[in-house]
């Protein structure tokens, strides 16, 4: 190699090193080193789920987001348990109506497919233990909870032939199968209740809303496996702005054909109710599983108070199509639906995978400490 070639080579190396080995700045104080759960140091074969989940904060990626979500929910619960500091007049004006006023109102939202799945039992636990204050779901989140009290759904696969299932009277939701007979049983149970509601509308001038109708259905189902049973028992309002978008809507349609005048369901009274809940709350926390109308209805109610104080999203939606379903929490901050100080977090995951883990480290542990 010539002297010129050697000099050029050294210059190239120096240039490459300067590009590759850029000097690092000082790591900020409090930075968390990345480290996952070490099974080799676990104490015996009976290490706890809690020990694994406690390592998630330093694991990175969505494990860290789940750990942050757990922190957020525990902050909601801690704040909710804080004694109220307000005058007696304010305490006499509680929201939601018929419930004890809390220092933090927890909104829980979930899409219908999650009630179709076994996540129904996890959701029911939170409602049964009276740990949330306001629920928003879609029509399937109402009907699937009630139908499962009448007849079960079954495990299938994602790849089952649709035409064959149709000819056999089986409906597929992901890898869950719902026989058509389930909806027949639902119709037989529901129609007499709708008849009663119509009589009350005409004779007592009762103005039905989705939440009032859902409260009635929860009272009538009489089954402790039901989310709505416990919501009715604890007077937790369940809002469903898209009540007609599902089998429940089919039944309302069938009922309207045979009834004149028909049953009327007022969504305006309900939007006033949920917005007033948000406005009259001292602090609010939102836990939203999935997207669509469920996510936006909770966020928009919190806009009326200039944003939720704590927010957790769990969904698989992406923001690149401009949808509200996939939007990050910071987009909601721009609209005033989440406070900038909320420490909001989105867990990019399918809710049946991670919500039971979150409940284990938050709601269940909270109740365990009380017991």
From Swiss-Prot:
Claim: Transferase is one of the keywords in the record: yes
Range of residues in the leader sequence: none
E.C. no: 2.5.1.46
EC top class, as a word: transferase
Reactions accelerated catalytically: [eIF5A protein]-L-lysine + spermidine = [eIF5A protein]-deoxyhypusine + propane-1,3-diamine
CC per GO annotation: cytoplasm
Molecular function terms, GO-annotated: deoxyhypusine synthase activity
Superkingdom of the organism of origin: Eukaryota
Chain sites annotated for binding spermidine: 143-144, 250, 296, 322-324, 331-337
Binding residues annotated for NAD(+), in chain numbering: 112-116, 138-140, 144, 245, 291, 316-317, 350-351
Keyword terms: Hypusine biosynthesis, NAD, Transferase
Pathway noted in the entry: Protein modification; eIF5A hypusination
Record-linked InterPro entries: Deoxyhypusine_synthase, Deoxyhypusine_synthase_sf, DHS-like_NAD/FAD-binding_dom
DNA-binding listed as a keyword: no
GO biological process, one term: spermidine metabolic process
Cofactor names: NAD(+)
Active site residues per record: 337 (nucleophile)
Family: Belongs to the deoxyhypusine synthase family.
Purpose of the protein: Catalyzes the NAD-dependent oxidative cleavage of spermidine and the subsequent transfer of the butylamine moiety of spermidine to the epsilon-amino group of a critical lysine residue of the eIF-5A precursor protein to form the intermediate deoxyhypusine residue. This is the first step of the post-translational modification of that lysine into an unusual amino acid residue named hypusine. Hypusination is unique to mature eIF-5A factor and is essential for its function.
NCBIfam families xrefs: dhys
Protein's UniProt name: Deoxyhypusine synthase
Organism: Caenorhabditis elegans
């Amino acid at each position: 190699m010539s002297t010129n070639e050697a000099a050029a080579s050294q210059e190239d190396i120096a240039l490459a090193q300067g590009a590759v080995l850029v000097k690092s700045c000082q790591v900020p104080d409090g930075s968390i080193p990345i480290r996952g759960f070490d099974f080799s140091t676990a104490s015996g074969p009976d290490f706890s789920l809690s020990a694994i989940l406690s390592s998630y904060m330093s694991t990175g990626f969505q494990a860290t987001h789940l750990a942050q979500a757990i922190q957020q929910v525990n902050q909601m619960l801690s704040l909710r348990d804080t004694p109220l500091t307000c005058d007696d007049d304010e305490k006499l004006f509680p929201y939601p109506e018929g419930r004890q006023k809390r220092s933090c109102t927890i909104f829980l939202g979930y899409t219908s497919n999650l009630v179709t799945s076994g996540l129904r039992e996890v959701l029911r636990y939170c409602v049964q233990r009276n740990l949330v204050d306001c629920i928003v779901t879609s029509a399937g989140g109402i009907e699937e909870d009630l139908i499962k009290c009448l007849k079960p759904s079954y495990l299938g696969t994602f790849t089952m032939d649709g035409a064959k299932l149709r000819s056999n009277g089986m409906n597929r939701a992901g890898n869950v199968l719902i026989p058509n007979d389930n909806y027949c049983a639902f119709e037989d149970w529901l129609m007499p209740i709708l008849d009663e509601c119509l009589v009350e509308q005409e004779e007592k001038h009762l103005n039905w809303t989705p939440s009032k109708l859902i409260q009635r259905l929860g009272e009538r189902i009489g089954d402790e496996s039901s989310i709505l049973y416990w919501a009715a028992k604890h007077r937790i309002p369940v809002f469903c702005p898209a009540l007609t978008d599902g089998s429940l809507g089919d039944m309302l349609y069938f009922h309207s054909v045979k009834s004149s005048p028909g049953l009327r369901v007022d969504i305006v009274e309900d939007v006033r109710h949920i917005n007033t809940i948000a406005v009259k709350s001292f602090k609010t926390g939102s836990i939203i599983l999935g997207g669509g109308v469920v996510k936006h209805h909770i966020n928009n109610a919190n806009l009326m108070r200039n944003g939720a104080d704590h927010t957790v999203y769990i969904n698989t939606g992406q923001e690149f199509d401009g949808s509200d379903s996939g939007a990050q929490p910071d987009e909601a901050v721009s609209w005033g639906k989440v406070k900038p100080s909320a420490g909001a977090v989105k867990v990019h995951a399918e809710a049946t995978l991670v919500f039971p883990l979150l409940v284990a480290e938050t709601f269940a542990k909270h109740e365990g400490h009380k017991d």
